[in-house]
Amino acid sequence: MPSVPSEAPASPSPKRVRTRHFQAAKEEGSRFTGLTSYDTLTAQIFDEAGIDFLLVGDSAANTVLGYDTTLPMTVDELIPLTRAVARAAKRAFVVADLPFGSYETGPQEALRTAVRFMKETGAHAVKLEGGERSAEQIRRIVDAGVPVMGHIGFTPQSEHGLGGHLVQGRGQGAEQVVDDAHAVEEAGAFAVVLEMVPADVAQRVTQELRIPTIGVGAGPHVDGQLLVWTDWAGFTTGRVPRFAKQYADLKDVLTEAARMYRDEVGSGVFPGPEHSF
């Protein structure tokens, strides 16, 4: 996203990423990046690294709170995390996830939830799952002046209905992904996440839509990429998603540091004279 500098210029603060910058990036053919973040520490690091947007995802249910799925996550649990990220992000665009059960019953419930996130957290947009089935909710939120990021393909909040973590859009299912993408765009979303969608289907959607597409396991032919940060940083236990390249192994680094601390305390090496008053 060349139109928004990733490093702070001589002025006191860097220029904030806005929805128009994602649209400009699509039109210019420059790809942008997003990461999940759930706290001030990682938000500051990713912001300073030049990541364009930070998603405070309901994936915090797994990565922060220890739930097996995202379904138990509540609005009350997610709001403090979103607030922490928004405080730290000086440049990055902050998106708040709407958790399961906070928007499905209709447009008015969706608007109430979105307004609460915007008023209480400092987020710049909200994200919700679903294509055609969520179009009215998206439209109602957008009409109230709140930017919405859509999310189609594999939608984790619907994993039981989808039969598990399965790629969406294969074979005849491709047309449903395309229809969902157009429904999200027509409802007024400024961008749409395509999760676990075949690369050729994601490419078709990207070519057909005017708004930017964001891939999560959707191949290279999209406008931006999004990853859960614990996946690429080596913190995920068990099977790491195929689409998540591991850029670091921070779990081993922290484990070794904790062991060194334990051993030095046990042996009397720490604290030494230099750590004492």
From Swiss-Prot:
Keyword Magnesium: yes
Key words of the record: Cytoplasm, Magnesium, Metal-binding, Pantothenate biosynthesis, Transferase
Reported function: Catalyzes the reversible reaction in which hydroxymethyl group from 5,10-methylenetetrahydrofolate is transferred onto alpha-ketoisovalerate to form ketopantoate.
GO cellular component annotations of the record: cytoplasm
Residues that bind Mg(2+): 58, 97, 129
Protein name: 3-methyl-2-oxobutanoate hydroxymethyltransferase
Catalytic reaction equation(s): 3-methyl-2-oxobutanoate + (6R)-5,10-methylene-5,6,7,8-tetrahydrofolate + H2O = 2-dehydropantoate + (6S)-5,6,7,8-tetrahydrofolate
Cofactor(s) listed in the protein's UniProt record: Mg(2+)
EC class: transferase
Family named by the database record: Belongs to the PanB family.
